[in-house]
Structure formats: structure tokens, C-alpha cells
Amino acid sequence: MLLNIISIFSIIRHMAARRLDVFLDSFSDFEPPVSILVPAYNEAATIESSVLSLLQLAYSEFEVIVINDGSRDETLQLLIDRFQLVPIPVAYQIRLPVKPVRGFYKSNLYPNLRVIDKENGGKADALNAGINATRYPLFCSVDADSILQRDSLKRVMQPFLEDPRTVAAGGTIRIVNGSEVRDGFLLQAGLPGNLLVRMQIIEYLRAFLFGRLGWS
């Protein structure tokens, strides 16, 4: 309850900061480049739409690195077919120890898309493999089944522009059930008819919205 009360002040501060959006848009040339890391394990059902939506984010300079963490389904093959991936030789510094990497791919359709194929080691190990291959100083971790708003990268980078001491930032997680989604983007938010899912939405609001804002 105390966190919920404290979070109200953070929400008010956040709403006031949103008025700066138009001002910040004029400084798109100063946006720090970002590497988006997408660890994927058996994500054949959603990987194509998720990657496509990430490639369409409204941001000046970013790369998308999908890390196939030893998937046993068709995750890698779907990526190869959909985005015309071709294997490439890569020499990079192993800054973080990871499970063996089997290969690197680049897309013939999207120059800012790369895929790492490695042995299974878990989400943290997959992220470490992605960090080893990043080209930019900042990285953003995104689950392979997540749906982002087009301006989400601009918003999560805003704290870095406002305060150079910022080392990490995060967003709010919500449940997409009952909402209208097209081509990997949220068109209209809605509520599901299932009561249990509605209860889960309330729990997500408590944990990820009020909880995080309260602690911040």
C-alpha cells in the first residue's frame, strides 16, 4: 500500500515529463545508438512478428541481435527464411564467458539485423553472447514474445538524455490478451473476457507499474 501511494507522485512526475516529448523529438540526431538483444529459445510461434516489429521501431540508429539459444524447434530456420539470413565470419572479443557459438548470420533485407546461433545455456548466457557481439555502448534486452510500442525505444532512452549518470532504465509490462495487434504492434488496448486473466492484469499493474514507480 505504501509503495502504491508513493508511486502516485512518480506517475505525476512522469506525466509532466511526457510534455517534453515534442521537444526531445527535435534532438533525434543526439539519440545514443542502441543494440537490442533478443534471446530466443523455442520461439517459433512468435519470433517472426516480434523481430519484424523491432525492426520498425521509431529510432535513429539501432541494431537487432537475435540470440538463438539452442532452440529445438524451427526458430532459427524461420529467421533464415523470413529475413534472408546468410552465414558470416565474425571475429569478436569474448568479454563474457558463454556456451559455444555455432555461427553468425546477417540479413540481406535488413542491414541492422544479425542472428547468433549458440548452444543452449539459458537466458543469461544468451544475453552475454549478445553483449559480446554488440556494436554500441548501450543495449536493451527484449523477450522474444514481447510487443513494443513504436516509440518505446525513444522513451526508455529518455533518462539517458536527461541525466548522464543514468546506467539503467526499464519499461512497464502489460498483458496483451484482449487487445488488437497487427504486424507486431499494439493498435488498440483492451480487456480479456477471462476473469483469471483480468486478475493477472491487476497483479501486473501492481508489480510492474506501481511497484517500480514506488521504488524509483
Model-flagged regions — what are they?
Residues 1-30, 212:
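N-terminal membrane-anchoring/stem segments of glycan-assembly enzymes
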Residues 6, 88-128, 132, 150-151, ...:
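Long helical/loop segments within the catalytic core of UDP-sugar-dependent glycosyltransferases
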Residues 17-21, 43-56, 77, 125:
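Short, well-formed alpha-helical segments that are part of the catalytic scaffolds
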Residues 32-35, 63:
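Cell-envelope/extracellular polymer assembly enzymes that use nucleotide-activated donors
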Residues 52-61, 82-89:
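Short, acidic, metal-binding catalytic loop of nucleotide-sugar glycosyltransferases
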Residues 68-88:
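A conserved acidic beta->alpha catalytic loop
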Residues 139:
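Short aromatic/hydrophobic "clamp" motif used to bind/position activated sugar donors
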Residues 143-147:
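The conserved acidic donor/metal-binding loop of glycosyltransferases
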